[in-house]
Every structure is written in structure tokens, then in C-alpha cells.
Amino acid sequence: MDRSEIVARENPVITQRVTNLLRTNAPLLFMPIDIHEVRYGAYMLFMYGSLENGYKAEVRIENIPVFFDVQIESDNTNQLFLKSLLTAENITYERLESITQRPVMGYREKEKEFAPYIRIFFKSLYERRKAITYLNNMGYNTAADDTTCYYRMVSRELKLPLTSWIQLQNYSYEPRGLVHRFSVTPDDLVSYQDDGLTDHSIVMAYDIETYSPVKGTVPDPNQANDVVFMICMHIFWIHSTEPLASTCITMVPCKKSSEWTTIVCSSEKNLLLSFAEQFSRWVPDICTGFNDSRYDWPFIVEKSMQHGILEEIFNKMSLFWNQKLDTILKCYYVKEKRVKISAEKSIISSFLHTPGCLPMDVRNMCMQIYPKAEKTSLKAFLENCGLDSKVDLPYHLMWKYYETRDSEKMADVAYYCIIDAQRCQDLLVRHNVIPDRREVGILSYTSLYDCIYYAGGHKVCNMLIAYAIHDEYGRIACSTIARGKREHGKYPGAFVIDPIKGLEQDKPTTGLDFASLYPSLIMAYNFSPEKFVASRDEANNLMAKGESLHYVSFHFNNRLVEGWFVRHNNVPDKMGLYPKVLIDLLNKRTILKQELKKLGEKKECIHESHPGFKELQFRHAMVDAKQKALKIFMNTFYGEAGNNLSPFFLLPLAGGVTSSGQYNLKLVYNFVINKGYGIKYGDTDSLYITCPDSLYTEVTEAYLNSQKTIKHYEQLCHEKVLLSMKAMSTLCAEVNEYLRQDNGTSYLRMAYEEVLFPVCFTGKKKYYGIAHVNTPNFNTKELFIRGIDIIKQGQTKLTKTIGMRIMEESMKLRRPEDHRPPLIEIVKTVLKDAVVNMKQWNFEDFIQTDAWRPDKDNKAVQIFMSRMHARREQLKKHGAAASQFAEPEPGERFSYVIVEKQVQFDIQGHRTDTSRKGDKMEYVSEAKAKNLPIDILFYINNYVLGLCARFINENEEFQPPDNVSNKDEYAQRRAKSYLQKFVQSIHPKDKSVIKQGIVHRQCYKYVHQEIKKKIGIFADLYKEFFNNTTNPIESFIQSTQFMIQYSDEEQKVNHSVKKMVEQHATASNRAGNPAGNPAGNPAGNALMRAIFTQLITEEKKIVQALYSKGDEIHDLLTYIINNINYKIATFQTKQMLTFELSSTHVELLLKLNKTWLILTGIHVAKKHLQALLDSYNNEPPSKTFIQQAIKEECSSIKPSCYDFIS
């Protein structure tokens, strides 16, 4: 069935009504989804979406004025002058028009409020852009000068949101296939608000399955033998998870299902063409998949290119027909679109943007919703939402079914693929993704594409311009081009009161916070660029005329920045653009939150089976989406105001907001202190306050006069919390009145949400406690935690568990009469249990995550990825599977564990493995498959101890001298060192490792002495060899033979070393084999290997010296050995050639050949020796072994060598 047939089947009543309206050319409702512009020639705007019943529609808007504005700042600049400038540059324009507007930058008094501008009209965007560039380069200020997407300006000027219902009037109508085409002018479009309307836009969710003959690899579209063999597709109403139609396109026949239509294709080319054909029958408004912008779309496009059908496929799918291949690749195949996930993270997307259908990657949407998610797979996101999971079908089985062509099994593959596509829509609906982004688009006058693919600041900027240009906000002329010098520096820091660290168990602490501090400051002090006064003379002049000004000053890049903002004094007409917009957003959100609360209460009273439940649920989701959109804009407002790349950026405003925040927090601080309250901590927009002791006198005395049981103490704590709540409510009202008197408005307010008791502060922005919100609640399992490392992304379960145990134990109510263990005692008790009783930990407790960012200098991750790359290359050489070592996508998080490596020491006895985390990292799947031992001690030392030190670093013994600047860092370092010594004292493995190092150093000292003796003998012999000019060859032979005999004399050294190692092994066995260590004595083997390697290295240096000392000897050896090689070669081919040699030469040749054999044998022996050592053989090679090795090697390299010599 095609789209029109499906719509008629599903919505017969609405379809009949829409059909009647089309016949009579009556007004129609249209929901835009996708926007495209014709930028060359006469400008036209195309909007694609659906009519009220779900019909696909194209709305072409013609006769849109194309213009921008130029500010006239000189009497010499007029229309004639501008015309001459444009004509001189061959810029074609239509006409010029004089207008007046308010400039956005700088305060202007009432009589000079408006400035003259000239509006220049054009026929095309090309000429307009040329003119903007030219006049900006000439120094003119321009406005309404969008140079990227003109449709945003159209939306702002017409007050026509691009993501909500629009009523089409006076249209020209032309049905064409499945698409209903309309032509209108801007006057024929009217914004239509009706939240009760149901949107019947269509979403297509799809998934592809691919195959590679190279097992264990991810199929690559650039490989000819890697194919896409199946594509499964559903279509849905945009708000529903029930499929309207489903199709499975496959290259392999599979058992048919009643739940979907199966199309069997004979080749990959036909499969791709069938996909495009089905797409064209459904003409969806939105196309979505999971990770399709990173895999599915690039695979489809690349394979279509290889088959030479991309142009055909695009023109089937697109509503812009007859596009050529180069145009498709240049304009519609988006290869690298950077999508903002969070402030720190972006992701690259690739997709084919066919006009009429908006591409949307569900994975990107979910990552934006869960920016700190450890796992970003489809299965993980489904689990987070409590939705049904995907089907479990391993790739190796899927590929096996594909190879065997088993239709029964291929039906399982089809079901797997169909369900994956279904789950994409499930996630979109569960998270209300499209309605949320639509509401953002409505507020910001941007398209749905903008709301998906652009960051929040871009939309805030567009929203500000939309407010500014209309009469009710003063017709402010705004540019979209950032101007002026862009300075980078820090604005005034927040006012911070260092925390009083430690555990507070005697009286409650309450957090007092400014509500939306920065937006509140903007509203209170009228921070807005058109209210800014730059000069002191102008400020004095305005104050003399009775204006009230707010002065700001701060240091920025070693200079004083100052300025004044004209205050509004609560007079609406005096409010600046920023405060007006924020107040409007705030009022709208307040109304929506009230409505949301009522709808929520109704939802709780109605069962899901009630006929009206779905409608109520839909209404609740829509209202929630609206208030969320408002919240997003309010929260990102200051970010755009402080962004030095924004056209609205004003340094005195950005710094003035933060410095005013400082001022007000100090103001409240002094007020609270003077009231007799105490301050535990303060930072940026909040203070943590304790009430005066006198508040609790009566309840404390009642407790002291009681039997002092634990029940009485709990009652005391309960009453203290209630008294604190009451006192803070009163204090909060007093603070707000004090602020109102100071700044003259009620926009700047403080509120308290919870009382913390007990509470512990461990550092700046680091604290935890039991939160009491409406009533006292002493549940230690529901702690209020801020900044403690257990909530940090990537942490292991081990760290979280130990941290939670410490915090829960410290939060227990204990009477003063009982033993109240200090925090350091609690930490040591929990830590000891964690270290000594290691059997309590499971493999999952050690899994942690990290992000792969190739451009970031994360040494451990870089080392790990380098190792994984080497493994992949090694496996590929042998034709083995390597997918288990695949590199994650840049920016993607991956899971790993730290495994135990054999403790290694260098030749001097120093450990070499402590600083190489990257060498110990292993993927979780690999560590599980090979049952690799976890390096628990690494986790304890590198993760757990830092967390534990944070709890105790306030102890007196860890405090720094007065001359230390960073006292917290010093105390933290000392506390961690203290805990490291504590762990060494209780961990058996750590003791064993220390002993190993001592034995290594003893052995090294002994062996080093012996080596020096032997090297001395070698040196004398080779010295004689080089000085013996009469018979150098004989001396060389004797010296080299001595090297072979040296191996016999090594036994003395080895015997002594072996004895030390055996003693160490005995001592280690008595200490017990530590958990996670393999049995035996690998440390001893490593020691032997290290010593042997040292001996070999020293010998090799001497042998290599033969080739570098003495040109004569070198040349002689080379000449004769070459002749030997030549003779052997000729002998092997039985083609002996005449070669005249004197008897002296023959004798010399034979002696040198013997020498060469011995020399070769030494290298061979070393090779065999190294192989032997690598297998942990404790016994050194004997003389017999070396001689046998020489014979074997020589006979293998030169089979006829001995025959020739004889």
C-alpha cells in the first residue's frame, strides 16, 4: 500500500473532509517537517510535511522579499550613494527603501532612539550575499543579514514558526502522484495554534543487515565482497508505536510472515533499488534508524555508488526530481555533520538528506538525553527506559544463516531486523523527542532540522532576533554577524567561602540558593546591549537627568573594564530586550507548570484503560514539552550572552553578570552572619547555613533530662530538623526582602529546598548528607550527594560501593554518649574489609568506561588503543577474527578492566609496571573470555584511595604549613599517602612485591660484579686481537672460542643467583599466594631472564665491535667471507669455476671460515638462548647445547658448508 491508501484506511473521516476542502480551495492545515531553499535565481522556499489527515504535502512559497538593512551613520550616506557603491561592484539590486530602527548596541535617549537604515532588496540570495560581504568590508553595520539560511529570517519576519501548524489560504493546488503540491505567497500563510490537533506526519524507521566473508570484522562498504543483504522498514504515525505498514527486503529467501511484506531480490543492486521504490511509495516525513548516520546511510550510499545507481535511487526518494550525481553528492549527501551531544562532546553524522524527508538518528537523540551514559547501544538505551529489549541474535549466527540460505533461519534474521527498526520508534515516542524539538523550533523560529542538528546557542540567538525586530519589543535592528575583536579570558570568578570540612552530627545545615541566578540578575539590573552606556561622561549626564544606572567594573586580561546599564525601575517601557524576553519566557513557563501539575493529578486518578487516558497522556506530554523548551532557553540564555562569537556579545554585560552575582552573594553572606547564623560553605549561587545554637536549647535540654536512649536521640534530631526548616523559611523571606530593597526589584530571590543532617563537607562542591525536604527522613540509603567521585562518569562499581559504605556508615545517628568513630576510623574499617576480604568482589565490580578521543592526550587510552591496533593487525595476518579488538568511534565510550600483569623489574630491581595503565587495560569481553586475573591492588591504589583520602583530608596531621598555597591539594596528597601505607601493611601481595624488589637488587649487585670480571677478561683478549698484527686470525679464533667456554664458567654465577631466587620463592610461599596471582614463582623466572639478558647484551657489544674496529680486518673478513659464500653457491649448483688461490690464501680462508662458523654460532646460540629464556627456563644453556646449535644452524643455512670445507 502507498501512503495515500494507508491514510485513507486509517483516517477515513478526516480524509473525506480534507478532500472536500481541496475541491473548494478552502483553507487547509499543514504541519511542516522539512525545509529546502532555492538559492539561485528567484528565491523560493519549499516546506514539506503533512496535511491534517496525513497526506504528503509540498508548499512552495513564492514572492518572498529578499533584503537586508544598512545603518546610516553619516549625512553623506544616502540612497544615491549606496546605489553608486553597489553599481560600481556590479551588484544587481531591485530597489532601496529608507526605514528607522533601534540599533542593538548602546543606549540611545528617547529623542535619538531610532536611527536611519536603508533596506536593500534583491532578486536572488547570491546578489544579496555579495552586497553584505562588500558593505561589511567597507565598515558598514548591517542588520537582517543572515548569510547561511535565509528561511530563518523569513520565519522571524513573518512570525511564522516552521515546526507548528500553518493554515494555507488562497493557494494554488496541483496533485502530483502521492504528493499534494501547493503554491502560496507569504500573505497566504497564517500561524495556527491548537494543541488538540493530532499530527499525522509519518515516520519511517529502518534497519539494515550486512555481511562480510571475513569473519570477525565489521562489514565495510568499500570492500566489494561485503554486502547489505536485508533492509527492514516500518512506518508509523509520528506519535504512535503501532506500525501502519512493514516491509522486509532481502537477498535471501526467507519464510514469509503475516506481520510484514517480504520482497526477495536477486542482487544487492536490486535490493537497494527496491528500498528506494518502497521509500517513494511511503514518502515519509521523517526517516530514522539507530546509528544510521554512522553506518547505515554511509553503507547504502557507498554501495549505490559502486553499482552506479545513486542518482536513480536519490531521484526515486526525493521530491526534487532529476538531480545529477555531482549535485546529489555536493548538496544532499551530508558527509560530516557535527552534532552537539553535550558541552564537551560532539559526534559526526553522515546521511542522505532527500528533500521532503528529515533524517534523524535515534542514537544521537538518546545520547543528548543521556549525555553521561556509560553504554550507548540500542539495548542499553532500551533498558534505561524500561522498554522491551531487542532480539538477541549474534552476528556469527546471522552470517551463518545467510551463507546457508536457510529460509527458516532467515526468518529469524528478518524478525531481528524488524524489531530493531521498531525499537527506534519506541525510543522516539517514549522520550517525546519530536514534540520537544518542535516546541524549541516554535520558540526560536527555526526548523526541525535546526533543532536536531544545531546547538542551543544558535537557537537562542535566532529567538532574540525574532523578539527584537517586532514593534512590541522596540524594532531593534539585529545582525547575525559577529563583529569586533574577539578576546579570550576569564570573567570575574564566583564568590567562594571555603567549606568547613568534616562530619557535622550536632546540628542541621541548610542550603540557600538563588533561583536561576544569571537570568534573575539580567532581569533585575536590566542587562541588555541596547541599555549599555560606555562612557562616564554620558553616564553622569543621564544620572543628572534622573536616570538610574547600574555600574559594573571588573578586571579582564589585566585591564579594568567598566560600564553602566540604564535600570528599568520596574517600568515596562524601560526594560531592555534581554529582560523582556526572559520575563516573557518565565511567565509562560509558570502557566505551563501550573497546567502540567493539574494534568499530572488527573493522570494519577485515571486508569490506563480509561477511554480518555491516551488523550490526557498526549496533552500532558505536549505541555511538558513546551515547559521544557522554555527551561532550555532560559538556562542557555546567559551562555549565549557570554559567548564571544555571538553577534549579541558585549564584554561589560558578560562580566557584569558574574560580578553582580559575586556582589549579591557577599551581600547575603554578610546579612546572614549579622543575624547570628553560621556559614559552612558558599559558592557562586548558594550558601550552606547553620542556625544559632540557641535555637535548639529547649529541645537539647529536654533530651539531656530524658533517659538518653537512642529513641530519645532520634526524637531530638527530628525536632532539630523541624526547627531548622521553620527558621530557614523565615530567614529566606527576610533575605528576599533585603535583596528587594537593595536592587529595587523582586526578580532576584533565594529559596531553600532541603535541610541536610547529618552532613559532611569534603571540599569545594563536594559534600553529602541526609536530605530532609518536607518532613524529617533519616534514611541512609537515600543520600544527598554532590561532587563526590562515586557519581563521576566512568567510575567502577568497586569505587562506588566502597564510597557508599563509608558515607552510609558515617550518616548513622549516634548519641554523643556513644562512641562516635571519627571519619578516618570509618574509612580504615571499610577499606580494610575491602582489601582483606577480596572474595566479596565480582568481575562486574571492576568494569569501568572511558571515551576514545584520538585528539586528546589520554596516555593510558592511547597506549591501550595502540595495543589493540597491533593485535588486530597480527590477527588479520593470520586470517583470524579481530572484531573483539575493534576501535570504538571517536567520542564513543568503551568498557574495560585492569588486569594483573606479571610484576616486572628492571635490571637494577626497580618495578617497571606501575605507571603503565594502558598496558594493563583489556576489553571486558576479552578479559572474561580468557578469565584474566583482575589487578585489584591497582584499583585500590589508583581509584579507591583517592576517594577515601577525600573523606579524611581535614585531619590535623595532613594539614600543610602556612606558606603552601593550595592547601586542599596538599592535604589530599598527604591523606592518600597515609592510606597507601595502610594498605601496604594489610595486603599480602604488596608485601610480596616489596620482597621481590629487594631480591632483585641483591642479585643484580652480585651478578654485576661477576660480569665486570668476565668483561675485563674479554677486553684483554680482544685488545690482544686488535694489537696482534702478526697473527690476527689465530688470536680472533682463540678469543671467540673463549666466549663459548665462558658459558661453562657462568654456572658459578647462576648457582648463586638461583640460590637467592629459591630462598625468595620459599619465603613467598610461606607468606601465602596472593589472590589473583598465578601459582609458581614467575617473579623468580623474570629475574633469571633479566640477568641472562644482561649477560647477552654485554657479549653482543663485544661481538659487534669486530665489525666496527679496524678497516683492514673488516675488509679482509668481508672479502674472504664473500668468497666463501661464492664458492658454496657454485658448489651447490655443481658449476665449479676456476679460482686461483695461493696456499697461504687457502689456509687463511679455511681458518676464517672456521671463525665465521663460530661467529655465526654465537649469534645462533644467542637466539636459542633468548627463546629458552622467554619460556622461563631457569637453567642456562650448556656448551654442548651451543655447539649443537652451531652445527644445526650452519647446516640449515648452508647445507653444503661442511662438505665444501672438507
Swiss-Prot record:
<dbReference type="GO" id="GO:0003887">
    <property type="term" value="F:DNA-directed DNA polymerase activity"/>
</dbReference>
<dbReference type="InterPro" id="IPR023211">
    <property type="entry name" value="DNA_pol_palm_dom_sf"/>
</dbReference>
<dbReference type="InterPro" id="IPR036397">
    <property type="entry name" value="RNaseH_sf"/>
</dbReference>
<feature type="repeat" description="4">
    <location>
        <begin position="1083"/>
        <end position="1086"/>
    </location>
</feature>
<dbReference type="GO" id="GO:0000166">
    <property type="term" value="F:nucleotide binding"/>
</dbReference>
<keyword id="KW-0808">Transferase</keyword>
<feature type="repeat" description="1">
    <location>
        <begin position="1071"/>
        <end position="1074"/>
    </location>
</feature>
<keyword id="KW-0235">DNA replication</keyword>
<keyword id="KW-0239">DNA-directed DNA polymerase</keyword>
<dbReference type="InterPro" id="IPR012337">
    <property type="entry name" value="RNaseH-like_sf"/>
</dbReference>
<dbReference type="InterPro" id="IPR006172">
    <property type="entry name" value="DNA-dir_DNA_pol_B"/>
</dbReference>
<dbReference type="InterPro" id="IPR006133">
    <property type="entry name" value="DNA-dir_DNA_pol_B_exonuc"/>
</dbReference>
<feature type="repeat" description="3">
    <location>
        <begin position="1079"/>
        <end position="1082"/>
    </location>
</feature>
<dbReference type="InterPro" id="IPR043502">
    <property type="entry name" value="DNA/RNA_pol_sf"/>
</dbReference>
<comment type="similarity">
    <text>Belongs to the DNA polymerase type-B family.</text>
</comment>
<dbReference type="GO" id="GO:0006260">
    <property type="term" value="P:DNA replication"/>
</dbReference>
<dbReference type="Pfam" id="PF00136">
    <property type="entry name" value="DNA_pol_B"/>
</dbReference>
<keyword id="KW-0238">DNA-binding</keyword>
<protein>
    <recommendedName>
        <fullName>DNA polymerase beta</fullName>
        <ecNumber>2.7.7.7</ecNumber>
    </recommendedName>
</protein>
<feature type="repeat" description="2">
    <location>
        <begin position="1075"/>
        <end position="1078"/>
    </location>
</feature>
<keyword id="KW-0677">Repeat</keyword>
<keyword id="KW-0548">Nucleotidyltransferase</keyword>
<dbReference type="InterPro" id="IPR042087">
    <property type="entry name" value="DNA_pol_B_thumb"/>
</dbReference>
<dbReference type="InterPro" id="IPR050240">
    <property type="entry name" value="DNA_pol_type-B"/>
</dbReference>
<comment type="function">
    <text>DNA-directed DNA polymerase involved in viral DNA replication.</text>
</comment>
<feature type="region of interest" description="4 X 4 AA tandem repeats of A-G-[NK]-[PA]">
    <location>
        <begin position="1071"/>
        <end position="1086"/>
    </location>
</feature>
<dbReference type="GO" id="GO:0003677">
    <property type="term" value="F:DNA binding"/>
</dbReference>
<dbReference type="InterPro" id="IPR017964">
    <property type="entry name" value="DNA-dir_DNA_pol_B_CS"/>
</dbReference>
<dbReference type="InterPro" id="IPR006134">
    <property type="entry name" value="DNA-dir_DNA_pol_B_multi_dom"/>
</dbReference>
<dbReference type="GO" id="GO:0039693">
    <property type="term" value="P:viral DNA genome replication"/>
</dbReference>
<dbReference type="Pfam" id="PF03104">
    <property type="entry name" value="DNA_pol_B_exo1"/>
</dbReference>
<keyword id="KW-1194">Viral DNA replication</keyword>
